[in-house]
Structure formats: structure tokens, C-alpha cells
Amino acid sequence: MASEARPGVFVPRPHQLEACEAILAARRADRPGFLLGDLTGLGKTLSAWLAVSAMSEDDILIICPKGAIPQWRRTIAGSPQTKKHVTIVNFERTKSLLALNGTSARRSTRAKNNELARTGVPKRRWPIVVIDEAHRIRNPASQQGLVCRQLAAAADFTIYMSATAGQSPHELSYLSRLMTGAPAGPKAEMDAFRTLMKEMRIGRAKGRWKNWGWEPNEADRSAMAERLYKGTAAIGLRRRPEEIAGWPQVQRALAPIALDASGVRLYEATWREFRRELGLLGGSTRRPVGWAADLRFRQKASLIRCEGTADFVCDLLDNGQQVAISVAFLETSARLADILSGRGWRVGAINGESSGEVNEATRVAFQRGELDVVIFTVTESISLHRGEMAGGDRERSLVVHDMRHSAIQLQQIEGRCHRDGQRAVIYFAFAEGTVEERVAQIVITRMSAMDGLAGDDTALLDDIVRTFEEAN
């Protein structure tokens, strides 16, 4: 977001005005849309709204995660008034914007929803559509992907916003109209995108989309970056925080968590059970495929580390900081909250168990300095940075208690506190002397080099799988 000149009024920064002008230039050139790919924390919401406000169309549709709705409302309220008629809807409710031609003969709710997503038509048309966190529609066969693409196809201009557009080139098919000039419509767009992938000789674009394949390589990444952001016919704009004058670079650090004797024994037993479930003991050499086993191992390991993470967080709090803790599991969130509140700290939680209103109230309390710690499970669309609100001027740190096996998710998490020109050191916690130490080293190395372009996410997961296979 931008700085506040007075309560409720935002003053855009130069880089946000630059993004606004780039979007408007695409509109003037009669392009079908624009990809705003700035990294998290650079204020994409205000940049997009500035552009939308300057357009002549009055009816605007904004599609975003549920957690981002308060941010959009606040941005619109804190900007100069317009006569725009704005509809804001979260991804899960986009199906309500379509209607079937006739009555469905399907029996189950899921089947009816699938039919609606595939064959439904928009109840009305919005000339300007904004899709925030657009990577959510990268699967063209998903219900949200089908619905959002129809709404975008019916629009005159669509702004796609995402710091992490896709894991691999073929997941960028939702940008087909921008990249190929294809006629609007799911089939025409997919056909044109398939042809483009073949012309660029990127991966295997044959048959059904889910069967498309790609081996990560630098040549393809560079070619796709040129198409997206760098060439004369680039369809979007992407900047990193360090490229903005005066903005701090992301600082990452490893935070080893020491386990006590009982914790070590419990962790080792959990690790042995995990490998046994995957068939990695007793001479078996098959590749790990047990998603459920992996989830159980990570959940148990997460709980085992809670005491150590709480000790580390308390050190940061004792130094006068506020701390945001990213976790993957509700049980871990509850355990950390119990430990830290039991030590006298003011703790709040943001997760799926609470309503959007309750989560926003918790976020605001943290931003005003009324909470010392906030523990969150979401990976996107919330602002937890220093200086957003009065009373929230303490230095911030972000502790990633649960390492995600996705560079895209981790980059989204990093932008919760390190944003809007405010620095927050990001600590990646791991159990010292365990396989987590090697995984953490892989992740932090990859994140340091990641440009957010296609391929990094899948390559990171492959590296982690190899680490699990090779660990003793």
C-alpha cells in the first residue's frame, strides 16, 4: 500500500504511478488486459485501483481471495471518490455470477457446480475485471478457472495480479489472450496457447492439459520472462522490492531450533515411521508417493518444535519487536498461542476457524501494536508490516515455523511483513541436526535466487524429495 498523508487517504508512490500508467497504456493500445506481477509488498492493490479509477467504464468486477476483501475496501475508501459501481467477490463465490441455460439434471451439488462452471453464462457483463492473486485460476479445468476465464472473456479489459503467476509455463494459459491475441473464449484461448508452447518448443503441450509436461530449464524461463515482462511486446510489469529506490532487500536467515532429549527421541521415532510408511527402509528404493504420510510427518514434527520456536520468538519479543509466525497446521497455531500467552505475551491468531471479520479485527489489533504476536495459517492477502497504522511502529520479524515445500507459497508468506518499504527479517525455523536442516538450506538458497518465474516451484519440490530419499 502507499503511505498515508492523513487517516484514510493514500498517496501513491512513484512506482505505483508507473504501474498505473503501464496498465493504462495497455488499455489505450486496445489490449485485452495486463499482468501486474510486482513482488509481494509493492502495493499492487493501489496500483490497479489507480488505473481502474482513471478508466471511463463505470462497472467494475474485482475477484480476489476472501482475506483480501478488507484490503480492497480500504484501498477504495482511502482513494479519491469515483462514480464507479464496484462488485467485489471472492473466488469461492464466483459461480454465483453464472447461470445455466435451462435446468440442470445433475443430482449432486458437485456435479451441478461442475456443469455450471463448464456451460454457464455470465448473468451480467462487467467491462473491467480485476483478478487478484490470478495464479489461483492457472488450472483451466478447475471450477474457479473456468468461471473466471468466462468473466474475463466477456470483459473489455482484465487486470491480472500475481507475484507468482505459475509454477510452470503451461500454467500461464489464463494469460493466453494477452500472449497470443486469441479470440475470447476458453477453447480458442487454450488452442492458441497450445500452439504458442509448441512454437516456443517449451515442454510437451499434447493431449489434455493435465498431461502437459515440462522439465525446468533456464532457456525456457528466460524465453517466458521475455514474453511476460521484458520484451517490446511484454504483457505485464514486474519489479522486486530492491529495485524500488530506498526499499530494503529481503533478508532471510536460518533459525535452528534445539530439541531437548525427549524431543529428539520423539522426532527420530516420527522420522523412522515416516520412512517406513514410504517404503524407504528394508532395501526398498521406490520413490516417495505417500502424500498422507508426508503430511503426518510434517504435522508431528511441527508440534515437536513448538517449545523451541516459542523460545526463539520470546528472544525477539524481549528485544522490543513484534513477531508474526507462519504455521501450516491449526494444532500448531493453538499450541504456540498457549505457550506464548502463558509466558505473558498478547497473542492473536488468523486462520480458517475464524470469520473474516474476526480475522481482520485480529490483524488490525496487531497492526496497532495491541498484540505482540500474531500466528497465521494463510499464505496471501494480509498485511502485517510495520507502520501501517498508528501504534504499529515496533520493528517486525516473521518466523516461518512450518517450511512449505513450495517456493510460490513461501514467496507469498514472505510478503506479509516485508512490504510497503518496511523491512522485516524472515527467519526459517528448523529442528537442528535433522533432515529439516538440509531442507531449510535448500529452500533459502532457492528463494534467494528465485525470480518468481515458472519452474522454480517444481524444481524446489524435486530437491526436497531427493533430500528425504538420501537422508539416513
Where would I find each of the regions flagged by the language model?
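A conserved SF2-helicase RecA2
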Residues: 405-472
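Conserved P-loop NTPase motor "coupling/switch" region that bridges the ATPase
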Residues: 128, 145-244, 422-423
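Conserved helicase/translocase motor-coupling segment
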Residues: 242-346
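Conserved RecA-like helicase motor core of SF1/SF2 enzymes
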Residues: 379-412, 416, 420
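Conserved pre-motif I regulatory segment
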Residues: 1-35
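Conserved Walker A/P-loop ATP-binding site and its immediately adjacent core
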Residues: 45-77, 166-171, 328-331
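Conserved helicase ATPase core of P-loop NTP-dependent helicases/translocases
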Residues: 322-326, 335, 341-378
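Walker A/P-loop
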Residues: 30-51
